[in-house]
Amino acid sequence: MRLDKFLVACAVGSRTEVKNLLKAGRVTVNGKKEKSAKLQIDEERDEIRFDGQVLEYEEFVYYMMNKPQGVISATEDPKHRTVLDLLDDIARSKEVFPVGRLDIDTHGLLLLTNDGQLAHALLSPKRHVDKTYLAQVKGIMTQEDVEIFAKGIPLKDFTCQPAILELVSIDTEKNQSQIRVTIAEGKFHQVKRMVAYCSKEVVDLQRLTMGTLVLDENLQRGEWRRLTKEELEILLASIA
């Protein structure tokens, strides 16, 4: 691996910043100052230090994002901003991608990583990873709807697995409901279509959880952070 790529991967700085830091003599390789960005290193064996601190290479990274509306859950899109546009240069340099998708008008929890094995495990239909959503609904959801969700709703192209519908609040004067829905699948517009089957309409949808991950309530829309060590350990254990 090139030295500059290693330094960027260790969050020392952007590619341009790293070159300047190398020129300034702030990086050593095996005890010797190194100024060549193109130097090939062995990230497992060589000791690389920045300002005297030993750097450790991170192969995989994991970010939690509170995805805002109006942004595409993809790595690139010709028309819209993507979730990668919300990251900084260092995070983007890790070549992360979103695990699954949230519709452009859906907001909430999104996991981004460069760990393909983890992503595959979380998205595998065999694992039935639960996802919980909070929805604002035009119309009054009822106990009958709760039972319909529990049986598995037959949509035009597939039958949903049994889902949990919780009635959070009902406002008969405004003819609206707030509900919490937990599903094991993640088909296109699934929650909206399930609610529409009950003759109501989702007007706002937020994802709260995915597997063991819970959206950090301190993250504002459009903000992101690394998973904590505890969050990552619990997540990895859940798919082991």
Question: Where do the PLM segments sit?
Answer:
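Basic, flexible Lys/Arg- and Gly-enriched helix-loop patches that mediate nucleic-acid binding at interfaces
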Residues: 1-240
